[in-house]
UniProtKB/Swiss-Prot annotation:
Protein name in UniProt: Bifunctional protein GlmU
Residues engaged in binding acetyl-CoA: N389, Y390, S408, A426, R443
Gene behind the chain: glmU
Pathway(s) where this gene product acts: Nucleotide-sugar biosynthesis; UDP-N-acetyl-alpha-D-glucosamine biosynthesis; N-acetyl-alpha-D-glucosamine 1-phosphate from alpha-D-glucosamine 6-phosphate (route II): step 2/2; Nucleotide-sugar biosynthesis; UDP-N-acetyl-alpha-D-glucosamine biosynthesis; UDP-N-acetyl-alpha-D-glucosamine from N-acetyl-alpha-D-glucosamine 1-phosphate: step 1/1; Bacterial outer membrane biogenesis; LPS lipid A biosynthesis
Residues at which UDP-N-acetyl-alpha-D-glucosamine binds: 9-12, 23, 75, 80-81, 142, 157, 172, 230, 336, 354, 369, 380
Cofactor(s) this protein requires: Mg(2+)
InterPro entries on file: Bifunctional_GlmU, GlmU-like, GlmU_C_LbH, Hexapep, MobA-like_NTP_Trfase, Nucleotide-diphossugar_trans, Trimer_LpxA-like_sf
Described purpose of this protein according to its UniProt entry: Catalyzes the last two sequential reactions in the de novo biosynthetic pathway for UDP-N-acetylglucosamine (UDP-GlcNAc). The C-terminal domain catalyzes the transfer of acetyl group from acetyl coenzyme A to glucosamine-1-phosphate (GlcN-1-P) to produce N-acetylglucosamine-1-phosphate (GlcNAc-1-P), which is converted into UDP-GlcNAc by the transfer of uridine 5-monophosphate (from uridine 5-triphosphate), a reaction catalyzed by the N-terminal domain.
Region annotation Linker: where it falls in the sequence: 233-253
Length: 457
């Protein structure tokens, strides 16, 4: 295929979102909304992508700053789509080939559709091809006017359309493929003599027709692909459609999702074969989950790397953690950022971890806080154990070596180190290092006063 560039229009504020955040930067299934059309034109073959920015341009520029195929064009005053494209003339100066043009609030268009669209444009040897669709209720959309041969002669906006033209149900999607040599000459000559007093990009069709050049329509069957997102209702609907696509792709690849409608998996998440995901699970942040895992209901997993044969029980929350193979987590466990669990570790109910390394085969089965700690292999952490890691100013680490047994209700006042094969008696508060092969016990001796209750009645 010939060389292709793309223009993504992203300068508008999006007032109907009722938000301080510019519309195209609203999150959608793990990415800002504008990332969806940008990624799609890239997959469709665009060698260079020009983003037209205006409102909160610094947020858009910052997000895409490290993506070398993206350049920016500023539209300080929003005077219409034609004006927005004209702002790209310098950024695309000297480019020859086809230019894809679409809006930054159209996240559902697919790479396959755009690739077919481009191929059609070249086959027809058109100067302009408009991607269109038919709608049962086309209110608010520009209508596509054609001649007897089926070529596009005009696109008329809703407010400028006659009663007869409003009966047409083939609408302009706002996605175009235009010959670069024609495009910037045509937009430079646009006028704003319309109801909106804007420079309509669609008016370049009149120029092409006057020059007896071919303008084509490329209709697609699914109107949802070209749905624009203008408010939070449409944002939620777009998220639902993307979620269906993500979950379907995972299921086709070998993941079992018990109830796809209540399973929320973001773009960029990888899940292995024969893993089962139960309802009301949320997985995000580029999480990678291995094969043969079980993710029970209401688990929340963000930015984690999970090995094979891992069970994450109901209600567990995990973020920025690394999990080995054959690990059991939860129910109701909380793995905070910096947690690393080696193979065959068990983290039970109401256990919280943060910035720890826990060696293979170690267990913390219930009601425990482990923070800023290095724990060896085959260590048993008893119920109610706490690493006291914060002195009010700084965080300190606890080190527990291999094969240590920690009884219930133990506090480690960091910094402290426990030697291998030691035993920490239940109820002990550890304030100094424990040598290897030792018993540490630090609690007041039990005193029984017989008959005490009778005397004090």
């Amino acid at each position: 295929m010939a060389k292709v560039a793309a223009i993504v229009l992203a300068a508008g504020k999006g007032t109907r979102m009722k938000s301080e955040l510019v519309k195209v930067m609203h999150p959608l299934s793990g990415m800002p909304m504008i990332s969806w059309p940008v990624n799609v034109v890239r997959e469709a073959g665009a060698a260079v992508i020009t983003l037209v920015v205006g409102h909160q341009s610094e947020k858009v520029r910052e997000f895409f700053a490290d993506q070398g195929d993206i350049v920016f064009a500023s539209q300080e005053e929003q005077l219409g789509t034609g004006h927005a494209v004209a702002c790209c003339s310098e950024a695309l100066s000297g480019f020859t080939g086809a230019i894809l043009i679409l809006c930054g609030d159209v996240p559902l268009i697919t790479p396959e559709t755009l690739q077919t669209f481009l191929e059609y444009h070249y086959r027809q040897q058109a100067v302009i091809t408009v991607l269109t669709t038919c709608m049962d209720n086309p209110y608010g959309y520009g209508r596509v006017i054609k001649d007897a041969a089926g070529h596009v002669t005009e696109i008329v906006e809703e407010k400028d359309a006659s009663a007869e033209q409003r009966q047409i149900n083939e609408i302009n999607s706002g996605i175009y493929c235009v010959d670069a040599g024609f495009l910037f000459t045509a937009v430079a000559d646009l006028k704003n003599d319309n109801a909106q007093k804007e420079y309509y990009l669609t008016d370049i069709i009149k120029t092409a027709v006057a020059e007896r050049r071919t303008c084509c329509a490329f209709p697609i069957a699914d109107p949802m692909e070209v749905m624009g997102v203008n408010d939070r209702v449409q944002l939620a609907e777009a998220g639902r459609i993307i979620r269906v696509r993500i979950n379907k792709a995972l299921m086709v690849a070998g993941t079992t999702i018990i109830d796809p409608e209540t399973t929320y998996i973001d773009h960029g998440v990888v899940v292995g074969r024969d893993t089962t995901i139960y309802p009301n699970v949320c997985i995000s942040g580029g999480t990678v989950i291995g094969d043969n895992c079980v993710i029970e209901s209401s688990a929340v997993i963000k930015g984690c790397k999970v090995g094979d044969c891992v069970t994450i029980k109901a209600g567990s929350v995990m973020e920025d953690s690394v999990i080995g193979n054959t690990v059991a987590i939860g129910p109701m466990a909380h793995l905070r950022s910096g947690t690393e669990l080696r193979d065959e570790v068990k983290i039970g109910n109401f256990v919280e971890t943060k910035k720890i390394i826990m060696g293979a085969g170690s267990k913390a089965s219930h009601l425990t806080y482990l923070g800023d700690a290095t724990i060896g292999s085959h260590v048993n952490i008893g119920c109610g154990t706490i690493t006291c890691n914060y002195d009010g100013v700084k965080k300190h680490r606890t080190v527990i070596e291999d094969d240590v047994f920690v009884g219930s209700d133990v506090q480690f006042v960091a910094p402290v180190s426990i030697g291998r094969n030691s035993l920490i008696a239940a109820g002990t508060t550890v304030t100094k290092d424990v040598p290897p092969d030792s018993l540490a016990i630090a609690r007041a001796p039990q005193v029984n006063k017989e008959g005490w209750k009778l005397k004090n009645k």
